């Protein structure tokens, strides 16, 4: 089994780190005839397995064709371990037979074995047999294997060369792919390592549960993310089996050899419109690592600040220090409009976070192998050194920014702006009753790449962000929905916070609308809602915890009505604290009656 195996890439590296984990997961069996300390590999970042976990096992000697390796004699030693991925018991056979995996270095004991439970193969690099030191390297998923690998005879069989990288499955594979997976997994669907890739409609439905409005942006992002991970899946499938055919009628047989480039995304919209939430929710739906970076903190190399490689380190940490998982993640770079050449040309100093940072980001966006340094105080030191190699060709980069006054650039390009004061297009739209936000949204719908270049981004940077998504400012109705409807709505969050103290929080309809109007007046979008709620509920949150011991006079409910909110230009009296039983309904009815009377008076005043 050792001679015939040839692996082209590693999926992930799992290093033995925890003594408690080792004593639970690894039971090593040593020979009675073996010397106590046999160096197997050159010393590296070794980790000690406690000697209490050792048992003994007789050495086996394999000669002739005993391992499929000619007529030379090779030593073998067997150990029983628990799989690092699924904890199922598996056999590991160490041998000094040369492997193609390690350049056929002679005299080195090593092992490549397969877990029948999770269909994963591991290459074990021991540095000493007693005490056992080394690390597991996960090679990948194996297709077309039998479940019965517990017998000693199976340990001597050759591994199949048809490797399947863990990833995503698209619906286009149909029933053939399902049958193939069932066969490779022994018919047990719970063991399937390939998860289904959601369709664009399913992704959009997932976004609807958390994000209000921005319907066009949701569709564009859903298609972009689906195509990105479909591209990754088909690329990994093609690598997994060069002999696979996709059973698709194609006019051009050479289309199988076409390489698909990734398409990164640029989100444009005012603050509080949902750019960050959209990117974060997308990563949650497709279940990939997600990292956020602020472009304003990035600087050129050798300057004080964060290098662009720090973005990849954040993604590496979010992926649980798994390089392979990180290489399929999503990175959101916020405030990219702040690193335009225009914003730094007026400073008079060196442009350390403008065009230079854009140049540094080009290779990351396009796709390249980057050496990512590990900080000295990092969460986990990589055993291979002070840096890791990450390939960014499958990382989806989503950039975002407010791009203030970009609509003026669009208007000038359309020759609708007059020299000096005013613009005819804005005048026409304003006289038609459209708000300023509606005017901006209408202009940005016709945004082109040349407008971003005129704004201050370099052409090479814009060219690597082919998908442009414009978001509009949220209106009053949408802000009310943000407060009440999504799964993680702000109103629901504060209700849960008070419920932890057995207190009921209630908002009247008039109060929620007034809160939305106050947020719109601050031009902060949905971000302004939390600060408004904090100011309204601060006094109640201060009083509630101490009222638990007051018995029947303890606080039972907190009411937020229009009086608590105040007006658009002035603060209110704060949330009303209600004590005693059965008082909330009475106050709610009174508050709603007052609000209805005010609405009726306002309507009568407008009609006169």
UniProtKB/Swiss-Prot annotation:
Chief place of localization: mitochondrion
Transit peptide (first-last residue): 1-66
CDD domains membership: RecA-like_ClpX
Keywords attached to this entry: ATP-binding, Hydrolase, Mitochondrion, Nucleotide-binding, Protease, Transit peptide
Chain spans, region Disordered: 143-195
GO MF term (any one): unfolded protein binding
Subcellular location: Mitochondrion
One GO BP: proteolysis
Biased composition (Acidic residues): 172-185
Binding-site list for ATP: 270-277
Domain of life: Eukaryota
Any one GO CC term of the record: mitochondrion
Family per similarity comment: Belongs to the ClpX chaperone family.
Known role: ATP-dependent specificity component of the mitochondrial Clp protease. It directs the protease to specific substrates. Can perform chaperone functions in the absence of ClpP.
Cited NCBIfam families: clpX, PRK05342.1
Protein name: CLP protease regulatory subunit CLPX2, mitochondrial
UniProt organism field: Arabidopsis thaliana
Gene that this polypeptide is encoded by: CLPX2
